[in-house]
């Protein structure tokens, strides 16, 4: 498959480039940066042996290169518009950018189905993180008192993380509604109890040195349960990205969540 990478200078995008180069059945045909200084990726020392054009305009890249799939790891500010542009050009998309609303996902799914092309948006591409979310969903049926703590590097722009929100959404499907905390609790400092989703609390931590981590803490009388996943290196996401790229060939719709393509 001929693959282009949008946001290739970001930490995740950079790792995606290396992953595409490693995979025998994937070919890197173009990269995109919002303000490129280079015309070819070989102007970067790490990729000096390659011949891959660098673009600053997404539509121009799609029309000139005509890739089979674009992998997008950019920012919440442009993630939706990028994905819409990719799909409207009839190109498959794998998107790790977060911050999509349910309405945006629905609209993008409609475009994908009208073009009969596959696309996948996932808050997290680490298989371990997907399992963590599935375990939490199952536990929430029996432990409705639960809070989420998600921890990421301090350059992450959105909070809560897509993984935190997706976990809460999945737990809400099986969990009896409980408004977490005392009915008359008072925040001495606004925001101390975190964000609220369907009665659950989500807390976001941003610190240098972190990559992507999350724990889901359940409490009940006389017992507690903690489910935690840690990504220590961004390579933990790459097997999921490669799988998703290949899977788009089999799809004619947009899938939200890596768990929906795992056997």
From Swiss-Prot:
Note whether ATP-binding occurs among the keywords.
Answer: no
* Pfam short name (any one): DapB_N
- One Gene Ontology biological process: lysine biosynthetic process via diaminopimelate
**From the record, what ranges are coiled-coil?**
none
Which pathway does it serve? Amino-acid biosynthesis; L-lysine biosynthesis via DAP pathway; (S)-tetrahydrodipicolinate from L-aspartate: step 4/4
For this protein, the Enzyme Commission number is 1.17.1.8
Predominant location of this chain? cytoplasm
Keywords from the UniProt entry: Amino-acid biosynthesis, Cytoplasm, Diaminopimelate biosynthesis, Lysine biosynthesis, NAD, NADP, Oxidoreductase
Which residues act catalytically here? 152 (proton donor/acceptor), 156 (proton donor)
Q: Looking at the keywords, is Transport present?
A: no
Functional note: Catalyzes the conversion of 4-hydroxy-tetrahydrodipicolinate (HTPA) to tetrahydrodipicolinate.
**What is the enzyme's main class?**
oxidoreductase
Q: Return the protein name.
A: 4-hydroxy-tetrahydrodipicolinate reductase
Q: Where found?
A: Cytoplasm
Q: Which reaction does it catalyse?
A: (S)-2,3,4,5-tetrahydrodipicolinate + NAD(+) + H2O = (2S,4S)-4-hydroxy-2,3,4,5-tetrahydrodipicolinate + NADH + H(+); (S)-2,3,4,5-tetrahydrodipicolinate + NADP(+) + H2O = (2S,4S)-4-hydroxy-2,3,4,5-tetrahydrodipicolinate + NADPH + H(+)
Report which superkingdom the organism of origin falls in.
Bacteria
One GO MF annotation is: NADP binding
